[in-house]
UniProtKB/Swiss-Prot annotation:
InterPro entries: B30.2/SPRY, B30.2/SPRY_sf, ConA-like_dom_sf, F-box-like_dom_sf, F-box_dom, FBXO45-Fsn/SPSB_families, SPRY_dom, SPRY_FBXO45. It comes from Xenopus laevis (African clawed frog). This is F-box/SPRY domain-containing protein 1. The gene is fbxo45. Keywords: Ubl conjugation pathway. Residues 27-76 form the F-box domain. SUPFAM superfamilies: Concanavalin A-like lectins/glucanases, F-box domain. Pathway: Protein modification; protein ubiquitination.
Length: 280
């Protein structure tokens, strides 16, 4: 009888379980990772992923960009920059791993150059094959439409009759017949011929550079620093630590690429992006 009575009594209602708490906002969750853990994770990522991580929160951005020689940049540099470039003096004027990674990203393009040249495995040096009656050039992977930028260029072989450094738009040709000053041969490029010191644009000579009497000739291996100012629309040059002055003014509001052109067979030209120029 007692069992029947107990069976008739309804069980008390079971309270519904509370829903789980919502996850903390991403910014708060990211703050929980120790800096050493963040650096360890970041050290396995490629550059596009690192860019994305830098946008997550201020702490991640500081972790990535606060120390330009951190394990994050050292790991990435050792993975993408060739051993030759790191071992030799190619990058001797770049003091941090981050700067070396950036220089590699701005190197000469193996897909935007004459068919008669190739970019060596170090990622910074152009080699011109011994092709007769041809002028051959290359542009960098990245161009500039704003800001101030500097890069170094030097020849590691004979110049021949024409050896030009300068800038070019994406429309400027990178190969032509004969031995000519390819950079500066049309309105899409601006160049300085290191052989005769002439400035060239739109197929015309725009005077001699630098503007001094008995200007010294370029010596093989000598590093020339190129300074592009897209705010003032000027292109200037330095030799060693000597500022040679502005070579071109009134540059267009367009995307301009560092570029070189060469004519001598088996000569080599190296270009290294330095970043923002140091004033003074």
């Amino acid at each position: 009888m007692a069992a029947a009575i107990n069976a008739a009594v309804p069980s008390p209602p079971v309270a519904p379980s509370a829903p789980p708490p919502p996850p903390p906002p991403l910014g708060q969750a990211s703050d929980r990772f120790p800096s050493l853990v963040l650096e360890l994770v970041f050290s396995y990522l490629d550059l596009p992923d690192l860019r994305s991580c830098g946008l997550v929160c201020k702490r991640w951005y500081r972790c990535l960009h606060g120390d330009k020689n951190s394990d994050v940049w050292r790991s990435l540099c050792c993975r993408i920059v060739s051993e030759e470039a790191l071992r030799t003096d190619i990058l001797c004027n770049l003091r941090t791993y981050k700067a070396k990674v950036r220089a590699f990203q701005h190197g000469l393009s193996s897909s935007d150059c004459s068919r008669n040249v190739f970019i060596k495995k170090n990622g910074f040096t152009l080699h011109r094959n011994p092709i007769a009656q041809s002028t051959d050039g290359a542009r960098t992977k990245i161009g500039f439409s704003e800001g101030r930028h500097a890069w170094e260029v030097w020849w590691e072989g004979p110049l021949g009759t024409v050896a030009v450094i300068g800038i070019a738009t994406k429309q400027a040709p990178m190969q032509c017949q004969g031995y000519v000053a390819l950079l500066g041969s049309d309105d899409q490029s601006w160049g300085w011929n290191l052989v005769d010191n002439n400035l060239l644009h739109n197929g015309e000579v725009n005077g001699s550079f630098p503007q001094c009497n008995n200007a010294p000739k370029y010596q093989i291996g000598e590093r020339i620093r190129v300074i592009l100012d897209m705010e003032d629309k000027t292109l200037a040059f330095e030799r060693g630590y000597e500022y040679l002055g502005v070579a071109f003014r009134g540059l267009p509001k367009a995307c301009l690429y560092p570029a070189v052109s060469a004519v001598y067979g088996n000569t080599e030209v190296t270009l290294v992006y330095l970043g923002k120029p140091l004033d003074g």
